[in-house]
């Protein structure tokens, strides 16, 4: 239904779209974890965020937590937002890597750089169970926030179906 909705959005009027699906194959209908690019797709279709969250029983997510990914008992949180803030001369990660090297060489205290995830607002907010929508101004730390959704995928499919059928 994503393809049908996208085609319905850009196709000339009176274009006939045929979608082939089998009623014999049931919908799994579990919660679906998305990534931030789905927001761009929904914007393209003109689907408002509040409508999506209401109709699909959705919530926000700030990243993906990979539990037991590397090995049992280990986890890795992949945030959607950006790390720190770049300067005109350097990317943030280059500055952090330099501080880390200085700490390893004993030039500064070993714990001075901290861990890189401490410099990612999405990671810190997720650990604390907090969320605030991003702000457009680059002057605020909230401008580094990126997010996605977790919602009922069956409901999202129904929403896209209605969208495509209304335009076809």
What label would you give each PLM region?
Residues 17-22, 136-145:
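A short, surface-exposed helix-loop junction/capping segment
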Residues 143-162:
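Short beta-strand to alpha-helix junction loop
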Residues 6-30:
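Glycine-rich FAD pyrophosphate-binding loop
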Residues 33-123:
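Dinucleotide-binding Rossmann-like beta1-alpha1 core, especially the glycine-rich loop
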Residues 6-10, 44, 163:
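Active-site catalytic microenvironments for nucleophilic, acid-base chemistry
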Residues 18-20, 52, 155:
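General structural concept
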Residues 164-168:
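A conserved beta-strand/loop element that lines the FAD pocket in flavoprotein oxidoreductases
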